[in-house]
């Protein structure tokens, strides 16, 4: 009988195979090109059955001078173990900066991707938050978008669908006149029409379109088109219309003359203008649609397997100064030949006719191999630009992410050195039976800083041994740039989870918590951003305006 002698290299080969398998499993998912003809949001899970709710202390996560406060807490201010919350948008009352509201996708149980329209509000500048529940208990909702008018009235645009057969894919509009504490459906069920990946803006110019609302969405929609308008502050909405070249996955804004601009990506990025959307008795037309070079394309997958790695944000300067009516666009894009995303920025000083060459905001040296995703920004009343995004530059596994911040005081010509403003978190933890942490985060700026709503996985769920997705608020500000934040250990809950004998995960409404501190935005001297050379603008002819038919 032939005998075999074990090779001394066999254990080494096995070890190499195990390491290879482990490494492969840690690799990000492939990236993919998003398109609007297949919805990114689907009603494909029923609600999870009722369960006993466990809680742990709410998370307050300091990182140097920046402090993140958990938003989705129960009636007692505790973290709810086993739920998930992501894809958050923030609104700020311009008449009282201590009053803010955040909307998000609320998953009552991570075993089901059934989601609802969660919301929370604060009256003390974000130190404490109240989470009364969801807009409409038991109804599937997604893609939350919130905004405020100049009086401090908040609006919440929410996507709805049906199950098990998807018979509609429409939006409706809600309004709050008490700082986000309660919300009323003003458009009627599915009354805003719309569709998937919708966004909206409010005309606050005081002109003929004052308080008009404008909405854009993608091709997975309720009644065709990509755009519609409300001339009565969100109550009734007109039949949707097409936008030439079909820019989607973007946002809208209105300049001081009442011109509407829509940013998004079709075959390339576009900036579309309607100069007559503000005229109530005219059908809106898009009289200028200009291609924009953002230095890459939008993408999905990768570090956020089932979601986008970012969308296109467009915002306009309303400072009234030399930069007034500048149009800015920012997006996390996948550059040609690269497998990870960069935060890129462009500027127009001539009403969207031409744009600057794309400028990279993330300043890390090994940026080509790192992820810079969910990039978003806002324009302060004085014209300062604040940008935030998720960033893996400090992660050996190229997955753990931190929220980063940069600002510009010269219309985006130069940007300050990037600074981390949060602890590190693993975005692949706590998926609610859907492999993503949403599709976007948001920021709203005032004269001394920016208010950010983002999702992170700082809390731990002992029932499944994973971190869990929650919504956080953090205030970023230029004064923090002078300090080098020292990472502080994430504040881990130490209390034993407490079982609460209740059959629903949705917190009940409670009176607004007594503020523990009075929030007053304190003006800090704004350091001059460290100049970083802007690329020389690429010479190109001025595109001829494209007229909508």
Where do the protein language model's features map onto the residues?
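C-terminal PAP-associated
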Residues: 27-485
């Amino acid at each position: 009988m032939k005998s075999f002698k074990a090779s001394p290299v066999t254990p080494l080969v096995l070890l190499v195979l195990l390491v290879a398998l482990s490494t492969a499993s840690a690799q990000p998912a492939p990236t993919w090109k998003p398109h609007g003809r297949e919805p990114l949001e689907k009603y494909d899970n029923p609600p999870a059955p009722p369960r006993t709710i466990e809680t742990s202390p709410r998370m307050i996560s300091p990182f140097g001078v920046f402090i993140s406060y958990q938003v989705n807490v129960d009636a007692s201010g505790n973290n709810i173990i086993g739920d998930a919350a992501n894809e958050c948008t923030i609104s700020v009352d311009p008449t009282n900066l201590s009053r803010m509201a955040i909307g998000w996708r609320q998953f009552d149980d991570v075993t089901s991707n059934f989601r609802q329209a969660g919301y929370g509000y604060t009256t003390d500048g974000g130190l404490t938050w109240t989470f009364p529940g969801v807009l409409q208990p038991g109804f599937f909702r997604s893609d939350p978008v919130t905004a405020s008018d100049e009086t401090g009235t908040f609006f919440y645009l929410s996507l709805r669908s049906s199950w098990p057969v998807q018979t509609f894919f429409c939006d409706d509009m809600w309004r709050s006149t008490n700082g986000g504490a309660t919300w009323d459906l003003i458009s009627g069920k599915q009354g805003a029409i719309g569709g998937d990946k919708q966004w909206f803006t409010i005309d606050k110019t005081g002109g003929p379109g004052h308080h008009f609302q404008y909405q854009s969405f993608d091709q997975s929609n309720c009644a065709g088109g990509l755009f519609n308008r409300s001339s009565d502050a969100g109550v009734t909405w007109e039949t949707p219309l097409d936008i030439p070249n079909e820019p989607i996955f973007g946002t809208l804004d209105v300049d001081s003359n009442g011109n509407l601009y829509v940013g998004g990506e079709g075959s390339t990025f576009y900036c579309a203008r309607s100069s007559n959307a503000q005229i109530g008795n005219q059908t809106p037309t898009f009289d200028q649609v200009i291609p924009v070079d953002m230095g890459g394309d939008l993408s999905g997958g990768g570090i956020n397997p089932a979601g986008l790695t970012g969308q296109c944000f467009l915002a306009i300067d309303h400072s009234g100064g030399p930069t007034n009516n500048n149009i800015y666009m920012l997006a996390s894009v996948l550059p040609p030949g690269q497998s990870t995303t960069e935060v890129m920025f462009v500027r127009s000083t001539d009403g969207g006719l031409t744009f600057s060459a794309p400028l990279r905001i993330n300043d890390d040296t090994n940026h080509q191999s790192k992820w810079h995703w969910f990039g978003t920004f806002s324009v302060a009343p004085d014209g300062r630009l604040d940008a935030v995004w998720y960033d893996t530059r400090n992660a050996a596994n190229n997955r753990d992410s931190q929220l980063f911040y940069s600002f510009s005081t010269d219309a985006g010509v130069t940007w300050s050195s990037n600074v981390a403003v949060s602890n590190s978190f693993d975005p692949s933890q706590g998926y609610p039976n859907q492999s993503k942490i949403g599709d976007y985060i948001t920021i709203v700026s005032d004269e001394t800083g920016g208010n950010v709503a983002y999702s992170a996985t700082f809390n731990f769920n002992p029932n499944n041994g994973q971190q869990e997705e929650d919504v956080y608020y953090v205030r970023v500000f230029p004064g923090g740039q002078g300090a080098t934040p020292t990472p502080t250990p994430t504040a881990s809950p130490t209390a034993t989870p407490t079982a609460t004998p209740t059959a629903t995960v949705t917190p009940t409404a409670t009176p607004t918590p007594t503020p523990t501190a009075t929030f007053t935005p304190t003006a800090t001297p704004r350091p001059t951003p460290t100049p970083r050379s802007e690329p020389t603008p690429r010479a190109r002819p001025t595109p001829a305006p494209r007229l909508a038919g």
